[in-house]
């Protein structure tokens, strides 16, 4: 009969052996949190290793993702499709055990973690998703959505500022099914955290309206079990269980020190650990009886079977609700989607209007969201400016089944929370702020791209066109930095029609985020043929053409397209053959086949001009090294928008003059 400590030691030794074998990794945290993990995973976690995607599973998030071997050991021991050979390939090319957990690479990994604190933020999003979905779909006696979100965090996660943003909001939202375990070992890479992290964590979380369980012995299984039971009794507050642990537990010479944090322990020390823990087995060998104690496939399958039976009864009693639930969970758009969106886009083209693209975005939401209950929006305290609310928005603070989150001034937290909402399933999140403040959200934006998360970023006030607020609020380099990030589609529409198309493409995109870059100021609408209207969805299309062998091509986006078109027509009046290309989404255009790209930007035309109120460098890929770019070289200034556009050269006359020089060169 194996004790709980011996079962936990299986985690410790697998982690130690994998790190040693890879000659790289972090053994200390898995050794320190193994006892907590054993209690949670064997006694409380609702999951099915035979079906990692079971909809009503509990979510487990390893926010301190450097300790990934803890999670891989758990997945292997409980019966997920992660054989011992994969643990032997830890941190190696093409393995299922990368250095930090990556969703999509390893069965059972809910979200990619590693940048500290973001896993915690994702978990807050998952807890929001669980509660909002359950409030919408559950009925008396049919709690088809009823699961917990469990999180492991370390000192580093709680030092990161994002932890304040998301834990403050989680307490405000009373997320009672969010339970966090804090691995309080007092050690980080530089040494003892007492020299730089003296917060009273318990009081901090009490101030956030969390239920706090302090001074829990993280190596005492009974204490851990009691604390989890107490946490589950509290339904109107998230809980944090502060566990006092020893990093590198079991290592005679390196436990409790930074030496055990992020490097292999060495063969000599590992031999001593085996003696200390009485683990008399060679590397990567686990006794059959321990495997048997850990394996959760049979129990997990029973849990899912019971849920399936309940859902079958739910389907019989609530056929419409159950059909809608399955549609959303399976990420299917409504049957009327194409009809509604295409009709709306055609309507806009026929009913021309000069409005800001942020207003066009709100109008589009009003139309599309009516048939998309899975849309869940939010803004970082800029809803009236971003125009992200529509007539049927309900705050989830006031209505648990609502569709809008007031995130407060928390751009980073907002973005990472919505990543978690997306990964939970059942929702398409959109989040909003000024384009300039993507800088606050940057790493969560990158993580969305890395994970191919379906998440729509709404970034308004997109250029010097926001005017008097000045260079602190005027984006310059942000557009380019977003465009060069893999997996993100960045749309900068020029009028209400392109805005509606951008929203349609963002919602239809199945893998990866989309950024909608929207103006503060009004934009004129352009005439288009039916072919041009259809070609918007290809990312770039011919807006104006002289219909003969071309002398010059203009490329522009957003608010600068109108002055570019006027300048081009002025050149055409002199007899030059010109083309104007609207390029609202460069990445979508880049994915088109060679024939379409040659059709829009024929290679024989070397004289090209790009016009956009953002940093110039990005556009050389389209105009060539000898092309002309009318863009930003510096930061902006504080002045009315019209004065700034004139100062920085976004005028018909300047575009005309520079193009004429190019033509005569």
Curated annotation (Swiss-Prot):
Residues binding Mg(2+) are 155, 185, 187
Which reaction(s) are listed as its catalytic activity? Answer: D-sedoheptulose 7-phosphate + D-glyceraldehyde 3-phosphate = aldehydo-D-ribose 5-phosphate + D-xylulose 5-phosphate
Is Metal-binding one of the keywords? Answer: yes
Q: Which domain of life is it from?
A: Bacteria
Alphabetical GO CC annotations of the entry are: cytosol
Keywords, sorted A to Z: Calcium, Magnesium, Metal-binding, Thiamine pyrophosphate, Transferase
Q: Which residues bind substrate?
A: 26, 261, 358, 385, 461, 469, 520
Biological process (GO) annotations? pentose-phosphate shunt
**Family the UniProt entry places it in:** Belongs to the transketolase family.
Function comment: Catalyzes the transfer of a two-carbon ketol group from a ketose donor to an aldose acceptor, via a covalent intermediate with the cofactor thiamine pyrophosphate.
Q: How does it assemble?
A: Homodimer.
Give the protein name, as stated in the record: Transketolase
List the source organism: Buchnera aphidicola subsp. Acyrthosiphon pisum (strain APS) (Acyrthosiphon pisum symbiotic bacterium)
- The gene designation is tkt
């Amino acid at each position: 009969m194996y004790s709980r400590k011996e079962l936990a030691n299986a985690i410790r030794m697998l982690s130690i052996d994998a790190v040693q074998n890879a000659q790289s990794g972090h053994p200390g945290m898995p050794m320190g949190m193994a006892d907590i993990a054993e209690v949670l995973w064997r006694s409380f976690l609702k999951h099915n290793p035979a079906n990692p995607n079971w909809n009503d599973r509990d979510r487990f998030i390893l926010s301190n993702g450097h300790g990934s071997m803890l999670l891989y050991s758990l997945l292997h021991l409980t019966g997920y499709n992660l054989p011992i050979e994969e643990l032997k390939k830890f941190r190696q090319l093409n393995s299922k055990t990368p250095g930090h957990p990556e969703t999509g690479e390893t069965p059972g990994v809910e979200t990619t973690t590693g940048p500290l604190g973001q896993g915690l933020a994702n978990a807050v999003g998952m807890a929001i998703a669980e509660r909002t979905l359950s409030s919408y779909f559950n009925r008396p006696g049919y709690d088809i959505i009823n699961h917990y979100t469990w999180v492991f965090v370390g000192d580093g996660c709680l030092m990161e500022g994002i932890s304040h943003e998301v834990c403050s909001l989680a307490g405000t939202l009373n997320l009672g099914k969010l339970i966090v375990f804090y691995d309080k070992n007092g050690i980080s890479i530089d040494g003892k955290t007492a020299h730089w992290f003296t917060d009273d964590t318990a009081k901090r979380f009490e101030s956030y309206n969390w239920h706090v369980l302090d001074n829990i012995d993280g190596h005492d299984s009974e204490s851990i079990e009691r604390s989890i039971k107490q946490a589950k009794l509290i339904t109107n507050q998230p809980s944090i269980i502060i566990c006092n642990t020893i990093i590198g537990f079991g290592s005679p010479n390196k436990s409790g020190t930074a030496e055990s944090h992020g490097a292999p322990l060495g063969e000599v020390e590992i031999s001593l650990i085996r003696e200390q823990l009485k683990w008399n087995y060679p590397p990567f060998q686990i006794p059959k009886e321990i495997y048997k104690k850990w394996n959760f496939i049979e129990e997990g399958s029973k849990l899912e079977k019971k849920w399936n039976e309940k859902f079958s009864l739910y389907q019989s009693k609530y056929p419409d609700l159950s059909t809608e639930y399955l549609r959303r969970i399976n990420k299917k758009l409504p049957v009327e989607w194409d009809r509604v969106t295409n009709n709306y886009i055609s309507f806009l083209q026929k009913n021309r209007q000069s409005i800001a693209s942020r207003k066009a975005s709100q109008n589009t939401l009003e139309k599309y969201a009516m048939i998309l209950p899975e849309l869940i929006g939010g803004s970082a305290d800029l809803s009236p400016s971003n125009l992200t609310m529509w007539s049927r928005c309900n705050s989830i603070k006031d209505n648990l089944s609502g569709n809008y989150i007031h995130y407060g001034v928390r751009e980073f937290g907002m973005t990472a929370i919505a990543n978690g909402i997306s990964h939970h399933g059942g929702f398409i999140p959109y989040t909003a702020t000024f384009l300039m403040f993507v800088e606050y959200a940057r790493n969560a934006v990158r993580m969305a791209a890395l994970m191919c998360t379906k998440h729509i970023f709404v970034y308004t006030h997109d250029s010097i066109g926001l005017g008097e607020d000045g260079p602190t609020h005027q984006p310059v380099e942000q557009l380019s930095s977003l465009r060069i990030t893999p997996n993100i589609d960045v749309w900068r529409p020029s009028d209400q029609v392109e805005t509606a198309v951008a929203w349609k493409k963002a919602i239809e995109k199945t893998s990866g985020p989309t950024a909608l870059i929207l103006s503060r100021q009004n934009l004129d609408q352009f005439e288009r043929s039916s072919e041009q209207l259809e070609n918007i969805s290809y990312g770039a299309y011919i807006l104006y053409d002289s219909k003969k062998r071309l002398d010059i091509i203009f490329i522009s986006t957003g608010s600068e397209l109108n002055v570019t078109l006027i300048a081009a027509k002025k050149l055409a009046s002199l007899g030059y053959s010109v083309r104007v290309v609207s390029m609202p989404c460069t990445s979508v255009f880049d994915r088109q086949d060679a024939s379409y790209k040659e059709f829009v930007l024929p290679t024989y035309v070397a004289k090209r001009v790009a016009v956009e109120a953002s940093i110039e460098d990005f556009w050389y890929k389209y105009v060539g090294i000898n092309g002309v770019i009318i863009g930003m070289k510096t930061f902006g200034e504080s002045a009315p928008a019209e004065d700034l556009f004139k100062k920085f050269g976004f005028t018909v006359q300047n575009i005309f003059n520079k193009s004429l020089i190019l033509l005569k060169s």
